[in-house]
A protein has these predicted regions:
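NAD(P)+-binding Rossmann beta1-loop-alpha1 motif at the extreme N-terminus of oxidoreductases
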Residues: 1-64, 70-72
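Rossmann-like NAD(P)-binding element
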Residues: 66-104
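Short, charged, surface-exposed secondary-structure boundary motifs
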Residues: 54, 114-117, 137-142
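ADP-ribose/adenylate-binding Rossmann-like module
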Residues: 99-119
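Rossmann-fold dinucleotide-binding core
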Residues: 121-146
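Conserved beta-strand segments of alpha/beta enzyme cores
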Residues: 41, 62, 104, 127-129
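Short helix-capping segments at alpha-helix termini
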Residues: 37, 98-102, 121-126
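Short beta->alpha hinge that forms the Motif I/post-I loop of the SAM-binding pocket
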Residues: 47-48, 84, 108-110
Length: 146
């Protein structure tokens, strides 16, 4: 277990690609906070202006222009974490296919089968690894993230 502690990981092991989080609600926002606390380059998208204002006021790199965020992900070879409700995943994947066609993708969406079916429909399996959220509450939005 000590090998997994952050203070036991070498700087070479910490050389991660930038992380792009699409969806800065409870889970996406919490991931952003944790990554930033570890000095990992992280930026993200939320569709709400209020979410962008709140996140940027706290010093986080958040935007509400999905095209710009995904273009940046592409140019920095970022890993994209999809953290949106299931009903929004198809549109997000379509945007990723258009603006970040070579980035790795994972997700923290609450269901796996539906996400994977959408991934297959877009022939994105080679760059996708499904994830699972390990936190959550009844609250939502940037303000609920910790």
């Amino acid at each position: 277990i000590d090998q997994l502690r952050p203070d036991s990981i070498s700087s070479a092991q910490r050389a991660l690609p930038p992380i792009c989080i699409v969806g800065l609600g409870l889970i996406g926002g919490s991931i952003m906070r944790d990554l930033a606390a570890e000095n990992i380059t992280v930026f993200g998208y939320t569709h709400t202006k209020a979410g962008v204002r709140a996140a940027t006021r706290e010093g986080f790199d958040a935007h509400n222009d999905l095209t710009a965020v995904l273009s940046r992900a592409s140019s920095t070879n970022a890993l994209i974490i999809i953290a949106v409700p299931m009903h929004a995943v198809a549109d997000i994947l379509d945007a990723i296919a258009m603006y970040a066609p070579n980035c790795g993708i994972t997700d923290v969406v609450s269901v796996k089968q539906g996400v994977y079916e959408l991934i297959q429909e877009r022939d994105m399996q080679i760059r996708y690894v499904g994830g699972h959220p390990m936190s959550g509450t009844e609250d939502s939005g940037w303000g609920a993230s910790k």
